[in-house]
Amino acid sequence: KEGDEILVPANTFIASIIAITDNGLTPVLIEANKDSLQIDENEIEKAISFKTKAIMLVHLYGQSSFTEKIIKLSNKFNLKIIEDNAQAHGCKFEGKITGSIGDAAAHSFYPGKNLGALGDAGAITTSDYELATTIRTLANYGSRIKYVSEYTGYNSRLDEIQAAILDVKLKYLDIELEKRKKIADLYLKIITN
């Protein structure tokens, strides 16, 4: 409800903040861990208040933000975990793929991403059937039945061309990620200052 708080890393992209504020919620910025550049698990608990409802984990730089401590805190305080998986397609935490671990996840398929479409594209994933139904309805003008709108919705459907491109590219994601890792390792080896 309006005024509820979502914990979010301070070093995130503005889109993560807008997703919170556009829904009448309050972002509470949490500093990043200086080593991982992910949300600092040691700063989370002191930021939790009676208004805190969720932690938004923004998986940055191809790394998972998940830690055992964050999962324990979410359970202890009954907080939802929302994943921003825009920069971490194919990333794993304890054998599970990011974007499939939290309560819901946002995925960007902007052309510059690891898994990019030809134009703007995105998706939301969740294992919560009721939430998935609401999201699908909102994305289709608020309608489950043609010309009957339950909500004020959006035109936010993934078009067939973008879906076809992503379907092909997804088959090669692991290979492409491995190539990126090799290039990054080469940079780290060559650039010494």
Predicted regions located by residue number:
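Radical SAM/AdoMet-radical enzyme domain recognition
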Residues: 73-78, 96-104
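Active-site region of PLP-dependent enzymes
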Residues: 88-94, 101-193
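PLP-dependent aminotransferase-like
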Residues: 1-85, 92
